[in-house]
Amino acid sequence: MGKVSFGFLGLMLVVVVIGVVECRRFEKETLGGGGGGGLGGGFGGGKGFGGGIGAGGGFGGGAGGGAGGGLGGGAGGGGGIGGGAGGGAGGGLGGGAGGGLGGGHGGGIGGGAGGGAGGGLGGGHGGGIGGGAGGGSGGGLGGGIGGGAGGGAGGGGGLGGGHGGGIGGGAGGGAGGGLGGGHGGGIGGGAGGGSGGGLGGGIGGGAGGGAGGGGGAGGGGGLGGGHGGGFGGGAGGGLGGGAGGGTGGGFGGGAGGGAGGGAGGGFGGGAGGGAGGGFGGGAGGGAGGGAGGGFGGGAGGGHGGGVGGGFGGGSGGGFGGGAGGGAGGGAGGGFGGGGGAGGGFGGGF
C-alpha cells in the first residue's frame, strides 16, 4: 500500500504523452487550419477551409481554402495573397493554379473571375494586373475582357500577350507575344485585331496576318503588324489607315478595295490599295484590287501604278500613270503614260 513503482509511473507518463499527441492531431484534423494555422486562420477552419502555411487559407483565408493559401484565400482553393473565389493551388497575388505573382486561374493582382492557368506577373487566362473576366491565355498587364469563347491555348507571352492582352488590350485580343502582340494586342489594341499586332493593333485585321504576311520582319507589317497593320492602324490601317486594309500595309495602308482588297497599301493609300503598294497604294482596284500601287496611286490602280496613277491604270504604270486604260488598261505606261499596250513617255489615253 502506498508504494508506486517507477515502472508504473513510466507507463503513465507514456500514456499522457500519447494522449497529448493524439489530441493535438485530432484538433488539427477537425478544427485547425489545414496545414498549420497561419495568421487569422480561415473562414470556419477545419480541413480544407482557410488556414495557414500549407493547405488552405493563410492570412484570413476564405472558405474552401486550397493548397498554397495566402492573404484572403478564397472559396474552393485560391491561395496567394488576396486569392479570389475559385482560386487554385500555389497562387501568388490573387491565387489560382500556376504560381508566380498572380499566376493561375483568375490570378494577377485583382485578377477577374474565370481567369486561367499561367504564371508570371498576372499570367494565365485572364490574369494580369486587374485582368478581366475570362481573359485569354497568357494575359499581361491589363489582360482582356474575354478573348472569345475558350480563349487561346498556349498563347500570350510578353507584356500584355494572349487574347485581348496588351496594356489595356481590347475585347477579343489574340494569341501573340511581344509588347501587346497577338490578335488585336498592342498597347490599347482594338477589338478583334489581326494576328500579329504591334503597337496599336487593328480593329479587325484580317485572318492570317503574322508570319509571312506583308512588310516588316515576320509578316504583317513592323509596328502594328498583322493584316493591314502599321503604326497604330485601324482595320487594316497603317498610320491612320482605313477599314479593310491590305496584307502588309506601309504607312497608311489601303481601305478595302472591293472583294478582297489589295495586299499592300502605302503611305496614305486609298480604298483598295495594291498588293505591293508603294507610297500611297491604289484607291479602288475592284474585286481583288491591283498588285502594285505607287506614290499616291489613283482609284483603280493597275499592277504597277505610278506616282499619282489615274483611274484604271495599266499593269506597269510609270511616273504619273494614265486616266483611262479601258477595260484592262495598258501594259506599260511611261512617265505620265495612259492606257494602251505600250504607252511611251507621256503616252495617250
UniProtKB/Swiss-Prot annotation:
Residues 1-23 form the signal peptide. Transmembrane segments: none annotated. It is found in: Secreted, Cell wall. Coiled coil: none annotated. It comes from the Eukaryota. Keywords: Cell wall, Cell wall biogenesis/degradation, Repeat, Secreted, Signal. One of its GO terms (biological process) is cell wall organization. GO terms for cellular component: extracellular region. Its main location: secreted. Responsible for plasticity of the cell wall. This is Glycine-rich cell wall structural protein. It comes from Arabidopsis thaliana.
